A protein has these predicted regions:
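N-terminal periplasmic "start-of-domain" segments of outer-membrane beta-barrel proteins
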Residues: 13-45, 74
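N-terminal periplasmic accessory domains that precede
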Residues: 16, 50-57, 73-76, 85-88, ...
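Short, glycine-/polar-rich solvent-exposed loops and beta-turns at beta-strand/coil boundaries
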Residues: 60-71, 93, 97-98, 129-133
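Residue-level signature of outer-membrane beta-barrel architecture
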Residues: 79, 168-172
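Short acidic/polar hinge/loop motifs at secondary-structure boundaries
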Residues: 93-121
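Transmembrane beta-barrel strands of outer-membrane/channel proteins
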Residues: 152-156, 179-181
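Repeated loop/turn-to-beta-strand initiation elements of outer-membrane beta-barrel proteins
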Residues: 174-177
Length: 182
């Protein structure tokens, strides 16, 4: 009886949709290598930074940090330099004008404002521009829920690291908001 109930739960697993072709598709119909993280995976991680969460949960990614804790963090996809990977947040391409190659560092994106991450590995330059030879990282931020909500979290870790997170969100017929502070 326990085995048959497990099979029933397999039918209840929601289908995750992704957007590698800039249109919504089922994960099973995508022809390229894709990793998708939901807010549950992101929130359960012990890391503060989204870059470390991506590195822990995705294959073919290399995280490199230029200095000690809190310094610039870049991600390489499929072994190519970071300049060959593009980062989008809610469909907007992220570029760092202070970077020598225009790439974007992920150290300042904290996990509490992220709803979903899609990592599209492989050549996607026809859809995401010439810098997407290694792949593209699509980050989708959280949206406000109906009503008004707030949340506090306190985290601590090794090397005397501490993190305090606050978020507030809400929505009604006219607007929707989400604010996250670290």
């Amino acid at each position: 009886l326990m085995l048959s109930s497990g099979y029933l739960f397999a039918d209840d697993i929601p289908v995750i949709v992704i957007s590698p072709g800039k249109t919504v598709q089922s994960l099973g119909t995508v022809g390229s290598s894709v990793d998708v993280f939901t807010s549950e995976t992101i929130n359960e991680s012990s890391h503060f930074s989204l870059a470390h969460i991506i590195d822990d949960n995705s294959t073919s990614t290399n995280l490199f940090q230029m200095g000690g804790y809190g310094s610039n963090i870049g991600i390489q996809l499929r072994g190519l330099e970071k300049r060959y990977s593009t980062v989008y947040v809610d469909g907007v391409k992220m570029l760092d004008p202070s970077s020598s190659d225009g790439s974007f560092y992920l150290e300042n994106i904290m996990k509490n404002g992220v709803d979903r991450v899609e990592i599209l590995k492989g050549t996607h330059s026809s859809l995401y521009g010439s810098n997407a030879i290694g792949g593209a990282i699509n980050i989708f931020t959280k949206k406000g829920r109906e009503g008004n909500h707030s949340n506090w979290e306190i985290e601590s870790g090794s090397r005397n690291t501490k993190n305090i997170l606050y978020s507030a969100d809400g929505a009604n017929d006219k607007y929707n908001y989400y604010v996250g502070l670290n």
